């Protein structure tokens, strides 16, 4: 039996009436193949039945399989791109409690554009992603794409979404699990359904950035930082999408992590992490860090002028 039933209904009023029961149980009392009308009756005494009109014959058939059964009513899904009004029902057998359903976030639904995008959906179902900021060049507009970074690592997934440019910005930095796509007509679902995760690898902060986890380099017996090779499992930052080490980043042509930057880091006694320190705390901070390290090991101080002169020669 399916875990989640999503149905497109005739009007926003019908969707809101069903959504008002979120977290409660109800019974699918009747489903008519002639009129496409379905009756959903709350199990709580004193509440009136709700009648909705389903959009497609296929959904009538699917809901008929739940007739006479108890379902948990979910919140009205948030829809993007003018894709109509939807309701969410979950078969009660083996499902979460009503309180848990009421406490979860709303589903987010959007329609994909093109056969290629629709074909991707089944493979994404059940997997978790962090919505990424569109990689847009300066002076250009974002294409109608939604970018998803797999939680735990992997290649970024780009999906063509209807009206994605203007309505998906609020999703950036948030973590979702992809739910199975409802099929309205034909045999392929054309709707991307995102289910908010209660807890994720990252948490949205500020403008939607994902909190990065810092993993320090291993410390050697001499007090220095052990070199981390390109193939090491240890990473500087882990956002669920990519791994970065100072050497591999420099090899990739980063403006900050050039050979000069690596050489400067080695000269300051910071090893290959020197360029990252320069980018994070600036030259003045590196000077202070270098002075502290020398004092800790009993080495004589070096004047600021001498150190800055050495930097200028790099």
From Swiss-Prot:
This protein's domain notes: The isolated charged lumenal magnetite-interacting component (MIC, residues 298-314) binds Fe(2+).
NCBIfam families cross-referenced by the UniProt entry: MamD (NF040916)
Compartments where found: Magnetosome membrane
Gene source species: Magnetospirillum gryphiswaldense (strain DSM 6361 / JCM 21280 / NBRC 15271 / MSR-1)
Deleted gene: phenotype: Deletion of any 2 genes encoded in this operon (mamC, mamD, mamF and mamG) decreases crystal size regardless of the protein combination. Deletion of the mamGFDC operon leads to smaller magnetite crystals in irregularly spaced chains, but no other phenotype. Deletion of approximately 80 kb of DNA, including this operon, leads to cells that are non-magnetic, lack internal membrane systems, grow poorly, have reduced mobility and take-up and accumulate iron poorly.
Molecular functions (GO terms): metal ion binding
Note: This bacteria makes up to 60 cubo-octahedral magnetosomes of about 45 nm in diameter which contain membrane-bound crystals of magnetite (Fe(3)O(4)).
InterPro entries tied to this protein: Magnetosome_regulatory
PTM comment, free text: Seen in gels as a band of about 7 kDa, suggesting it may undergo cleavage.
Major site of localization recorded for this protein: membrane
Record function comment: Helps regulate magnetite crystal morphology, probably in a single growth axis. Plays a role in regulating magnetite crystal size. Probably binds Fe(2+).
GO CC, alphabetical: magnetosome membrane
Induction notes from the record: Part of the probable 4 gene mamGFDC operon.
Region annotation GL repeat: where it falls in the sequence: 263-270
Stretches assigned to the Lumenal side: 289-314
Membrane protein topology class: Single-pass membrane protein
Keyword annotations of the record: Biomineralization, Iron, Magnetosome, Membrane, Metal-binding, Transmembrane, Transmembrane helix
Residue spans, topological domain Cytoplasmic: 1-267
Family to which this protein belongs: Belongs to the magnetosome MamD/Mms5 family.
Protein name stated in the entry: Magnetosome protein MamD
TM ranges: 268-288
Region (Magnetite-interacting component (MIC), binds Fe(2+)): 298-314
